[in-house]
Curated annotation (Swiss-Prot), chain A:
This is 2-methoxy-6-polyprenyl-1,4-benzoquinol methylase, mitochondrial. GO terms for molecular function: 2-methoxy-6-polyprenyl-1,4-benzoquinol methyltransferase activity. Component of a multi-subunit COQ enzyme complex. It catalyses: a 2-methoxy-6-(all-trans-polyprenyl)benzene-1,4-diol + S-adenosyl-L-methionine = a 5-methoxy-2-methyl-3-(all-trans-polyprenyl)benzene-1,4-diol + S-adenosyl-L-homocysteine + H(+). S-adenosyl-L-methionine binds at T94, D130, D160, A161. It is found in: Mitochondrion inner membrane. InterPro entries: SAM-dependent_MTases_sf, UbiE/COQ5_MeTrFase, UbiE/COQ5_MeTrFase_CS. Pathway: Cofactor biosynthesis; ubiquinone biosynthesis.
Length: 288, 311
């Protein structure tokens, strides 16, 4: 009798683990709505971004009607950057978020209002990490256009979100904007984020997410599947990449599930905020 | 009050689910707030709900102790040597407490909180996650002072031998003396508390303070209404607090004299209101025993008068 109850408990635990692992692996083997081998996924994603790199920013503007700028502003606002912080922006290839953080820290108005120590200003380091060198090149180009080419605060690093080359407990902030969807193993990326953050460091993730509001959901689906791939064809000349994009959004875990994954990685105070009814969600957490 | 009680219930109920053990904390803090595109017309109701969940230090404490023990159980399943998890509320309290030391120099600002976080050994990023940042520091201080006051009262303050007005004087004086080290930056704290976003919490804290003082004074032989009592005491407290801002006298002697006068005024006011009440009751006794009788009497008198002038 004891044996039966033990085996039932073990069985249910194994079942839980297997279903848990299965649901994670479904993300690892999904390339949009296609099923692919795990090893191939990162290569396929790599191809997507190599193809779209040059028109990435324009397509963002067109697809979101310019809203992506507001979303990124909100993300950086939530982060509250400060002078002297060490920040890591992962999958931030073209530098949108990094430039905003830079501006927030170095803005003259802010410096006048708060007594900012010039020395600590110098210590500010914003690392932009991306797995795709093409995206990084676009970012470096944009930096040069802003006159920040040789600025020591912005550091462009090529790297994999699942295996970061940074030290443990070295970052005050970690952001990933529209990038975690493309990672093969989400939980590895989250574990790496946990590893590199200092105690008290914040994790912020801006990502396309799930809409639940009834009528709006249908409109959104219509827009995603009918309009966006056509826009991709028209403007970037690449229908498949944008088809992958909208499909990958559907395969990504919904807000609550993702929040629990973040909590499982060890983070505290996991919260999320829906923007535009759930089209985009900002998940935030703290490492303690 | 009902909200915090409900959250406590939710936190307690959530512990029993085995799969997502850390969700009890999530349930009290995940408030998905919807924003309309671009306009950012954030619902203030949605905003004030999460600060209430984070700011009030007491209600969530039933959750953490249970979840941390179940958390270690789950931790053993996967990873043996994970250090005990610090609860966010405790960490926030530690940072805010350490920040208070920097307030006289840096003011009630993010810089003070970042300096405090460095003292505790936590990245200053954590300050970015406090809701309504500077207000968090001020509210923490107000809560601490209230707690200190309650401790002083419980540890045997000699109130029995004093008449009510003297008791009130003593309690308000004790409470205001706690603010003396921060007096140079107190105007900033007051302006932070007056900010529309922060008014609900600061009002609630002041109401609790006034309530506590009356409770310690004991109701005494007063016939005044509950609300009127607290309003008057709130008025006395606030005016003295503001007077104290510009008081340069030695050991704030002038402030205490001011306070004494105000407390006496309040009690005189009470007496004169009481006299007015007796007078009104006497009139009421003439036309009937109840206040309703008085009203009717007044109405009758008025209608009689107007009827008379028509002629």
């Amino acid at each position: 009798m004891a044996l039966r109850s033990v085996s039932r408990r073990l069985g249910s635990r194994i079942l839980n683990q297997r279903s848990f692992v299965a649901s994670l692996h479904s993300h690892a083997t999904s390339f949009g709505f296609q099923e692919v081998k795990e090893e191939e996924k990162s290569k396929l994603v790599g191809n997507v971004f190599t193809n779209v790199a040059s028109s990435y920013d324009i397509m963002n503007d067109v697809m979101s009607g310019g809203l992506h700028r507001l979303w990124k502003e909100r993300l950086v606002g939530k982060l509250s950057p400060f002078a002297g912080m060490k920040h890591l922006d992962v999958a931030g290839g073209t530098g949108d978020v990094a430039f905003r953080i830079y501006d927030a820290v170095y803005s003259v108005k802010r410096r006048a209002l708060q007594k900012v120590d010039e020395a600590s200003l110098e210590e500010t380091q914003i690392y932009v990490c991306d797995i795709n060198p093409n995206m990084l090149n676009v970012g470096k180009q944009r930096a040069a256009e802003r006159g920040l080419r040789d600025n020591k605060s912005l550091v462009w690093v090529e790297g994999d979100a699942e295996a970061l080359s940074f030290d443990d407990n070295s970052m005050d902030g970690y952001t990933i904007a529209f990038g975690i969807r493309n990672v093969t193993h989400i939980e590895k990326a989250l574990a790496e984020a946990y590893r590199v953050l200092k105690r008290g460091g914040r994790f912020l993730c801006l990502e396309l997410s799930h809409v639940e509001i009834p009528v709006f959901k249908n409109l959104y689906d219509l827009y995603s599947f009918q309009v966006i791939p056509n826009l991709g064809e028209l403007i970037a000349g690449d229908r498949e990449s944008y088809q992958y994009l909208v499909e990958s959004v559907r395969r990504f875990p919904p807000q609550e599930r993702f929040a629990s994954m973040i909590a499982d990685a060890g983070f505290e105070k996991v919260e999320y905020e829906n923007l535009v009814g759930g089209v985009v969600a900002i998940h935030s957490a703290i490492k303690l | 009050m009902y909200r915090t009680a409900a959250k406590r219930l939710l936190a307690g109920g959530g512990i029993t689910t085995t799969r997502l053990l850390r969700l009890p904390k999530l349930r009290s803090t995940i408030i998905p707030s919807s924003y309309t595109s671009g306009l950012c017309t954030s619902s203030i109701g949605g905003n004030t709900e999460s600060p209430m969940g984070n700011q009030s230090v007491n209600p969530n404490q039933s959750g953490p102790t249970a979840s941390s023990s179940t958390g270690t159980g789950e931790g053993q399943r996967r990873h043996e040597s994970r250090k005990p998890r610090a609860e966010f509320q405790e960490e926030q309290a530690r940072v805010l407490s350490a920040s208070l030391r920097h307030v006289p120099r840096l003011g009630w600002t993010e810089e003070a909180m970042m300096a405090g976080s460095r003292d505790v050994g936590v990245s200053p990023s954590i300050v970015g996650s406090f809701s309504r940042k500077e207000a968090a520091l001020v509210e923490f201080f107000m809560d601490e002072c209230l707690q200190l006051l309650m401790d002083r009262i419980d540890s045997g303050l000699d109130l029995q031998n004093l008449i009510p007005s003297e008791r009130i004087f003593k309690l308000i004086r004790i409470r205001l003396e706690m603010q003396v080290p921060y007096m140079s930056k107190w105007p900033q704290a007051l302006s932070i508390q007056a900010h529309p976003l922060n008014v609900p919490t600061s009002f609630k804290q002041r109401a609790m303070l006034v309530d506590e003082i009356w409770h310690a004074v004991g109701d005494g032989a007063s016939d005044l209404d509950w609300y009127v009592k607290r309003t008057i005491l709130g008025g006395v407290y606030s005016t003295t607090e503001i007077y104290m801002l510009t008081d340069d006298s030695l050991e704030h002697r002038d402030t205490w004299a001011f306070l004494d006068d105000r407390v006496k005024d309040a009690f005189d006011l009470k007496k004169s209101i009481q006299e007015a009440k007796y007078f009104a009751e006497d009139i009421g006794a003439g036309v009937g025993k109840s206040v309703q009788g008085l009203m009717n009497g007044v109405m009758q008198t008025m209608s009689r008068r107007s009827g008379g002038s028509a002629f």
